[in-house]
Structures are given as structure tokens and as C-alpha cells.
Amino acid sequence: MGVMEKIKEIEAEMARTQKNKATNYHLGTLKAKLARLRNELFVEQSGGSGSGGGEGFDVARNGDARIALIGFPSVGKSTLLGALTATESEAAAYEFTTLTCIPGVMQYKGSKVQVLDLPGIIEGAAHGAGRGKEVIAVARNADAILIVLDAGKEGLNRHREILERELETVGIRLNQRPPDVTVTKRKLGGGVRFSSTVPQTKLGPDPEKVVMQILREYKLISADVLAREEITVDQLVDVVLGNREYKPALYLYNKIDTITIEEVNQLARQPHSIVGSVNKKWNIGEPLEDDVLKQKMWEYLGLTRIYTKRKGSPPDLEERE
């Protein structure tokens, strides 16, 4: 049985299993196995590393930060790149216009932010559909991700869920921070010792048993585990694997000129979201103009401006962009 078949079998068993205190241990074991198999599959399909870019995707890092544009085909990523950086990326009324990674540089508040226009990804990208592997590999190396969605498309929420799932499958965690958990391997044996500074209600009635089983799944039979916050099985698995990328992500609902004001208001209330229209210049201005989108991108990148002065000279208090 291949890795994909094993993954589907575990997913089917998880779907059949009711979630309660009695099944918590079993579900934890299944989640650990599923994460291990997905990791094996990703490494296998990525040629052993999971970080290669592929032809047309190896772009030298430039500027103070890097942000990747992720989305389905024909949602306006190429036009958006031009609005942010004055870089021309071919745009057309048909899908899959962009076939490689197109870089541009956005200048904002004295900083240079590299913006990468990536080809549209489709469902199954994490397992190699389209050029999904290359696109997601670039996203893993970005400092932040801008997910672009077409506000006028049917199934908008499903599109968002698909993109989130594809990124999560390859170990990208959006708008999360690494859990405060430490796993220390021991050489002298002694089994798994689990301690926590807070109650672990999400690990079921016997957290230590669940932790031991998860570590055993990854052949860790002698280790100390210390949790300083309440965690889930998925978070513990992420810590054990140690190859997760935690990225700030902003969702841009583009083309709001094609929907009603009520729908715009509803989208604007979504977490980590901004609404706009590249064509109408709503919340998205010219490359050197300040606008709502650039302000949000700056905020999510977490950049800090540092002012210096020459030794012995008075400080220059004049504000410059």
C-alpha cells in the first residue's frame, strides 16, 4: 500500500470515529500517523528536501522582507503586482497566465519589500497538481503571505478553505505562533516524561498517555516534554516534526466592484482580511502612493524602523520617506 492510500485510509477512519473523551487517545494516534505520512509524501515529492524552487522559481532575495502572492488562477495577482511595484507581469482574461515566479519591489516607509507574483494554485497543489510544489516552496521562504481571492467568484469561502488546507498540508501555519512546548531527547533512557504548567484539557483525560503515544509514533522513546501552555495534538505533532513554518497571512478580497455593498461589508469583517479592487483603485493605489493595503502589509510583516545618527552629531529629526 502506497503512502497516498495509507493517508486516505487514515482520513476515512478519522471521519468515522466520533470525537469524545473515550476516543481522544485513538484520534491522537491517528493524527500523529497522518502528519508523519503527509510529511513523508511531501519530502518524497519535493526530491528529498521540500525547499527547492524549480526552474523559473529560484528568485534571489532582495530588499528588507519578502511577501508571496498566493491564490487561484485569474484572481488579479499579476495586476496587483503592477499596482504595488510597477513591475509588469502578464495578465489576461484566461487562467494560468503567469507560469513562473515574477518578482517586484515595493517601496514603502523607507523600506524595500520584495513581492512575488506566483502562478495560480489549484486543489491538490500540495501533492504536485499544477506547479503547486514550486509555488508552495516559495511561500515557505517568504516572510508573509498575501492570499488573493476573487470576491465575485462563487464558492468564495471554499476557495479560502482550499488554499489554507494546501498550505497547511505542507507545514505552513497561517497567523499562528509556535506553541510554547519543549521536547528534549535523552540518551540514557527513562521513557517519556511529560510535565505541564497549565491543565491540558485538549489532550483528553490522560494527557501523558497521549503524549507518549505520539512520541512513540515518531520513534522517540526517551524524552522530556514540557508544555507551558494548553496545546492540541496537532500542535504537539508540529513541535515533534520541527519543520513547520509560521507565517503571518493577509487575505485580500479583490474585485469588490462586482458584488453588493452588503457582501463587501460581510467580507471586510472576516479575520485578517481587507477588501479592495485593483482596477478601481479601491484601497489599492499606485506604487508610490500610501494606501490601506500597503499599510496592512507593513503591519503583518512586522517591520520596525530604526533611526541612527553619527557619533557626536545632533539627531536629525526630519521625517523622510
What are these regions (language model features)?
Residues 2-212:
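Conserved G1/Walker A P-loop phosphate-binding module
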Residues 16, 22-65, 70, 75, ...:
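C-terminal-of-GTPase-core extension/linker across diverse P-loop GTPases
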